[in-house]
């Protein structure tokens, strides 16, 4: 039987193969020549403007059914560059339901749903203050994924909140779960105004 657990790795291999064909990554000449011969047979048309969303990130996008939010997240994360043709945007986002099905069928680390309304949560005063502080930092700096990941650690320490508990608070707020994907990159991809409101427990 075909094991779909590592399907994301197979898709990553195809994406790299495509990038080699289009000269987007370095590769030995023999690999480039082989890719150039084979590639036209595995796509409907050779279109250099085509955009691919990493399969695991497509699974993250699948945590919401809001198609506009999916596109916003893909753009904010850099998976859809500025100037991408509309057909290429639609083509890239077609990968999302496939990745969502993969996450659900394998019940892997991406099998979560974005809580689109504020879950019923209660935090102690220190955690609530830390969440509000993190909201202020995001509102002021709009950090990228790694900077936000570090800000989460730093904010927890600044307020004397256990780091693990602070991450759990974040997952409860945004996924209504106790765990989930890397929180910084996940929040960085969301609309910052939405993230700020949720961290302030406003909706």
Predicted segments with their positions:
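Aromatic-anchored, charged helix-turn/loop surface patch used as a conserved interaction hotspot
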Residues: 93-142
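C-terminal accessory/binding modules appended to enzymatic or scaffolding proteins
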Residues: 123-171
């Amino acid at each position: 039987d075909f094991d779909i657990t590592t399907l994301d790795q197979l898709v990553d291999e195809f994406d790299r193969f495509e990038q080699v064909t289009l000269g987007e990554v370095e590769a030995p000449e023999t690999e480039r020549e082989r890719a150039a011969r084979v590639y036209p047979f595995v796509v409907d048309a050779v279109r250099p403007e085509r955009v691919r969303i990493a399969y695991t990130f497509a699974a993250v996008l699948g945590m919401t059914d809001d198609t506009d939010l999916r596109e916003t997240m893909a753009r904010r994360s850099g998976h859809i560059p500025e100037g991408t043709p509309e057909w290429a945007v639609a083509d890239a986002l077609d990968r999302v339901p496939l990745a969502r099905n993969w996450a659900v069928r394998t019940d892997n680390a991406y099998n979560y749903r974005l809580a689109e309304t504020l879950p019923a949560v209660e935090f102690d005063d220190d955690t609530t203050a830390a969440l509000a502080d993190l909201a202020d930092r995001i509102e002021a700096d709009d950090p990228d994924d790694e900077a936000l990941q570090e800000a989460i650690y730093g904010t927890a320490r600044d307020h004397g909140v256990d780091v693990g508990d602070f991450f759990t608070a974040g997952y409860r707020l945004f996924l209504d779960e106790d765990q989930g994907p890397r929180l910084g990159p996940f929040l960085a991809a969301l609309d910052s105004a939405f993230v700020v409101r949720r961290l302030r427990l406003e909706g």
